[in-house]
Amino acid sequence: IEDQPAWSTHIRSSASMRKSAKRHFSDVALAIASLGVGKEALLNDLKLTGFLFESLVIHDLRVYAQANDAKVYHYNDSTGLEVDVIVQKNSGEFCAFEIKLGIGQIDEAAKNLLKFASILEENCQKKLQSLNIITGTGLSYKRKDNVNVISLSSLGY
C-alpha cells in the first residue's frame, strides 16, 4: 500500500484544504488475488473495480512522474471538491487528472476539473499545464473545453 499525499497549493480561499494522504494498492493484482475475486465478481461490482482501476492508474502515473522528476498528489478541500491526481514538477508546473473507469463519467469529471482550474486561476501561483481524464475504455482526444481525455491504452498498455 502506498500513500498519496495531499497537494499544498497555498491558495487563498474560504475552503480549507484536507491534508490527509490517500492510500492505494501498489500492486492491484495482489489486491485482487487476496480478495479472491475473479472477472465475474469485478464486472458485477463496478465500485470496487473503479477503486482498483484508480490504484492501477495512480501507480503508473507515479512511475512516469518519478522518471520526470515529479511527484504525485491529490487535491481535496472542505467544499467537497476533489481531484484524483496532481502531478507536479519541482518547478511548480503541474497537471491535474481525474480517473474514471467508464466513458459515461467524462462530462462530470471535466466539469470537476474546470471548477478546480477556475479556483486556481484566481488564487494559485503554481502553473497549471493541463487538465486530463484517464478512462478505462474509448478513444483519446481533446475536448472543446481543452480537457484531455486519455484512454488507459495510451499510457502504454
Protein language model features and the residues they cover:
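Domain-level recognition of nuclease-like catalytic cores that cleave nucleotide substrates
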Residues: G136-Y157
